[in-house]
Structures are given as C-alpha cells and as structure tokens.
C-alpha cells in the first residue's frame, strides 16, 4: 500500500485528537502485522466483490452472522438509514454476551456508543455492570447510571462483558497490541466513518470482526483538496468501508427493509 509523504488530516463531527491519526500511522507502518496487512495490502479488483445476501426484517440476522463466522473471521453488513442496524447490533451483542464472549463495539463518536449501550436487549447486562465505556462523561453517567466507567481507558477484554470505545481509543489499543488478540468479537459501528487503517486496526483487536455501516453514507470529512486526494491515491484510504466491501472477499449482508 503506497501512501504519499504529505500528511492527510481527517475530521469527524469534531476534530479528532492528533494522537488518533498518529495511531493509524503507526498501524500502517507496522509491516509485520499479518492481521492488518490482510486489509492494507488488498488487491484492487476491476469488478466489485460486493454481492451481499439480502436480509429481511423478519429474518434473524444473528443466525446469518454467526454461521458465517464459523468459517470466516470477518463479516460486512450494510443497511440504509431506518433498517435497524443498531437494534440488530444490540441483539447480536446480547447473544454473544450470553455465551460469555468478550465483545468490543467501537465507533467514531461517543454518541453512537451511548445509543448502543441503551438498547433494550443489552439492559440486563447494563444493569449487572457488564457494560463499560471509555471516557465516560457526567451526562452519560446521568443518562445511563449503570454504565461502568473504564477508568484509564484501558483495554479491558473480559468474558461476558461489553466494552465500548471510540475509534480514537481503540486505535491506541491496536497500536500497542503485540501478538495477542484481546477480544473474541469486535463490532465496528459507523464503519463508513472509518479510514482504511482503522478498518485494519479492528482486526488486531478481535478474533472475529463485524463491520456494519452504510456504504452510501458520507465518508470521513477530509480537509484536503479532492484533486490532491485523487492524485495521491488517497481515496481508498478515506473511503475505507467502501474499499473493504468492494475489494476484499468475505460474507456480506444487506439490510433491505426499513422499520
């Protein structure tokens, strides 16, 4: 994977910490990591590999995902707004926790993580102190008093527990991770908001990885001229989820029904 020497700066709803970008830089430069190389060193294909199985609202998505993960380590799911992506993610996490799996859900924003924590299927685990979140704010403590603060924002993979962390925090965990893979499952929410190195970073953190997002959603906002992005070949990096779905073979699903 070739990257121009000029820095590329990406912005979400708020400017991300510089350390987030440095984390991703370190992940890209670590050429010895097999897990990330599977994503970063992808072969661009002329014809898209995206050929998802459509899943109706009446179907149990968990069955499809878990069956696929018996023979693969990764799954990609897409769904337009209103197709219940977060609801279905909550159901998946609840089933995994019931099987005493360690689960990380990571997303660009703290707001997205809060929405996950508030899902009805996760209420028993929230009430029993089995859901923790990094950088827990006073407002979040007020809204979800049973949500456990991850003091020190440490990588806290624990069987039967859900960890919630932003891309910024989880990218740091991935950067520092050597050979061990801490979580049984990593679920990347808002995957369309992830740069390609963040997509790759998630593979360092979980034995099984589920990416879920909307391929048609806007990619991360980048404060760099679009012509320069195209000239330097940065578009696949910026549109990480799109690059993943169109170039890397894996089980894929499309949520087609709105609730």
Where are these regions (language model features)?
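ASCE P-loop NTPase helicase motor core
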Residues: 46-149, 157, 162, 166-259
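Charged, amphipathic alpha-helical linker segments immediately N-terminal to NTP-binding catalytic cores
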Residues: 29-53
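A beta-rich soluble binding module of mature secreted/lumenal proteins
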Residues: 21, 36, 245-248
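Charge-rich, solvent-exposed alpha-helical interaction surfaces
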Residues: 20-23, 27, 38-42, 64
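Conserved ASCE P-loop ATPase motor domains encompassing nucleic-acid-directed helicases/translocases
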Residues: 1-30
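Short, flexible coil/linker elements and helix-boundary hinge sites characteristic
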Residues: 23, 30-32, 44, 100, ...
């Amino acid at each position: 994977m070739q990257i121009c020497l000029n820095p590329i700066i990406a912005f979400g709803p708020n400017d991300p910490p510089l350390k987030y970008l440095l984390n991703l830089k370190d992940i890209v430069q670590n050429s010895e990591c097999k897990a990330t190389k599977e994503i970063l060193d992808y072969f661009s294909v002329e014809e898209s590999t995206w050929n998802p199985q459509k899943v109706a609202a009446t179907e149990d998505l968990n069955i499809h995902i878990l069956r696929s993960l018996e023979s693969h380590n990764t799954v990609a799911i897409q769904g337009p707004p209103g197709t219940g992506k977060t609801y279905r993610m909550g159901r998946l996490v609840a089933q995994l926790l019931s099987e005493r799996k360690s689960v990380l859900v990571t997303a660009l924003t703290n707001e997205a993580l809060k929405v996950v924590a508030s899902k009805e299927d996760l209420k028993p685990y929230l009430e029993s102190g089995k859901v923790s979140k990094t950088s827990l704010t006073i407002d979040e403590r007020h809204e979800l008093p049973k949500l456990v603060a991850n003091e020190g924002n440490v990588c806290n993979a624990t069987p039967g527990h859900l960890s919630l962390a932003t891309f910024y925090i989880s990218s740091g965990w991935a950067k520092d991770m050597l050979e061990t893979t801490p979580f049984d499952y990593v679920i990347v929410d808002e995957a369309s908001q992830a740069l390609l190195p963040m997509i790759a970073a998630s593979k360092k953190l979980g034995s099984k990885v589920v990416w879920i997002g909307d391929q048609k959603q806007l990619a991360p906002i980048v404060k760099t001229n679009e012509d320069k992005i195209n000239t330097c070949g940065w578009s696949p990096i910026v549109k990480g989820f799109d690059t993943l779905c169109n170039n890397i073979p894996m089980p894929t699903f499309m949520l087609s029904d709105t609730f």
